[in-house]
C-alpha cells in the first residue's frame, strides 16, 4: 500500500527524506518493476531541463515519464534562450506558463533548486536530476533499490564508497541515506579528494584493508570536468587504477556475495577493470534498469501531490 502521506510538491535532496520515505519509494519502484500500471487522472506534461551532459539520467527520466503516460517536451539548453541570458527561474516559469506539470532539472550550481522551490509564485513540480557536486537523489534511490533487492535489509551492511569523494554528488547522497537506513558506511580514495563533511556518515580508510570486509563496493567516477586545471594536469589514469581502481587482483579478494556498483558513466580501466563491468557480481546495468522504476516512483509522488494520479 502506497503511503499517501508521503506525497510532496518537489523532490530535490536526500536531506528531505527519512528512512521511511526512502523505503516507501523503493516499494513503489518495485511495484512498477513487477508490472503495476500507472493511472493518470488528467493529461500530465514533463520537461527535462539539463544544463549538464547526461545519458542515463535524462533518458531514464524520459522513459519513466513515457511509462507513466506523461507527455514529454523537448528541451536543449544549447539552443534555448538560456544562451541569450534567460535566467533559470524565467525558464522554469515559462514551462509552468505553457502548462508543464513537472520539470526535471540538472544544473552545475549546487542547490540551484532553492531559488525555485522557495519562490511562492512557482507551482510547477521540481525534481532534481543532479546539482553540481551537491545531491543526486534519484541516483541515490535507485542505488538503494538495487542494494535492497540484493540483501533485503540495510542494517549492518558494510558499504564502501570509493573514489572522487569531494566532487561526487552520488557520494554525498548515498552516504547520507545509507547512514539513515542503518548501513555501515566506509570511504576510500585519494586524500586530496576526501570531503571531511562525510565523516558524519562513516569512516575513511585504506581501500585494500577495507575491501575484503565489504558487502557493497560503490565505485565513483573520477569527475574530470570538476577538477581544477592543476589537478586535471596531474591526474594519471593508470596510476589511479593501480591505487584506487577495482583491479582483477582486488576483485578476487572481495567477500563472497559482495556486489559491485557504479553510477556510470564508467571510465573503464580507471575506476574498474573493463572485464569486471559485466562480471557476475556487478550490478551496474541492473542499477540502470532500476533507475527507470525509481524515477517512475519519484514522479508519481509529485503527480499525486498535483492530483494527477
UniProtKB/Swiss-Prot annotation:
One of its GO terms (cellular component) is cytosol. GO terms for molecular function: amino acid binding; aspartate carbamoyltransferase activity. One of its GO terms (biological process) is 'de novo' pyrimidine nucleobase biosynthetic process. InterPro entries: Asp/Orn_carbamoyltranf_P-bd (IPR006132), Asp/Orn_carbamoylTrfase (IPR006130), Asp/Orn_carbamoylTrfase_sf (IPR036901), Asp_carbamoyltransf (IPR002082), Asp_carbamoyltransf_Asp/Orn-bd (IPR006131). Keywords: Pyrimidine biosynthesis, Transferase. Carbamoyl phosphate binds at residues 56-57, 106, 136, 139, 264-265. It catalyses: carbamoyl phosphate + L-aspartate = N-carbamoyl-L-aspartate + phosphate + H(+). Belongs to the aspartate/ornithine carbamoyltransferase superfamily. ATCase family. Heterododecamer (2C3:3R2) of six catalytic PyrB chains organized as two trimers (C3), and six regulatory PyrI chains organized as three dimers (R2). This is Aspartate carbamoyltransferase catalytic subunit. The gene is pyrB.
